[in-house]
């Protein structure tokens, strides 16, 4: 069972993710707990027990996080249940998923097409949305490359464990 401090950390994560990203608090609590739990892979039942929540609440939170690409589900041979863990190698979990910004740019351009004959002031928000999204689409791949090089340097220096070894 987790300690009171670990539950408090999960609660803090729940509030942060609810406030900053509009997630359900349980999804944020689940992310927080998955960041600190041992072992890293947990079943729905284990997570429900640890977080003092129903299995359905955990399953719903896990489905939300899975849809967002923040967790990975796995199942060992012969097991009848999934095990869940944070997937730090997925582009969405690290913030490097450019498709989100491509979709935002496309949506802004769709709006701009509707306002083709409108004055520039009316199009200003959509023009800036498209420009910002295009900027991120262009810059994120290089930033991701820089992050991966930095992460490898931290691992080589022993300052960051290799999470690939702990799957």
Outline where the language-model segments fall.
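Amphipathic alpha-helical dimerization/coiled-coil segments
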Residues: 91-137
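Glycine-centered, phosphate/nucleic-acid-interacting loop/turn motifs that mediate DNA/RNA or nucleotide
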Residues: 69
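Short alpha-helical segments that sit at the start of domains
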Residues: 2-28
């Amino acid at each position: 069972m987790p300690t009171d401090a670990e539950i408090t950390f999960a609660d803090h994560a729940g509030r942060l993710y609810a406030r900053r990203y509009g997630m359900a608090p349980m999804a944020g609590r689940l992310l927080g707990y998955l960041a600190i739990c041992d072992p890293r892979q947990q079943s729905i039942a284990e997570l429900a027990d640890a977080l003092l929540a129903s299995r359905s609440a955990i399953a719903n939170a896990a489905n939300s996080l899975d849809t967002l690409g923040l967790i990975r589900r796995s199942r060992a041979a012969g097991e009848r249940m999934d095990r869940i863990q944070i997937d730090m190698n997925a582009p969405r979990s690290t913030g490097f998923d450019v498709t989100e910004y491509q979709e935002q740019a496309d949506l802004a351009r769709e709006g701009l097409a509707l306002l083709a004959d409108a004055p520039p002031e009316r199009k200003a928000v959509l023009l800036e949305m498209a420009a910002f999204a295009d900027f991120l689409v262009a810059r994120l791949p290089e930033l991701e490359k820089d992050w991966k090089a930095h992460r490898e340097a931290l691992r080589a220096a022993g300052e960051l464990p290799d999470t690939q070894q702990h799957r």
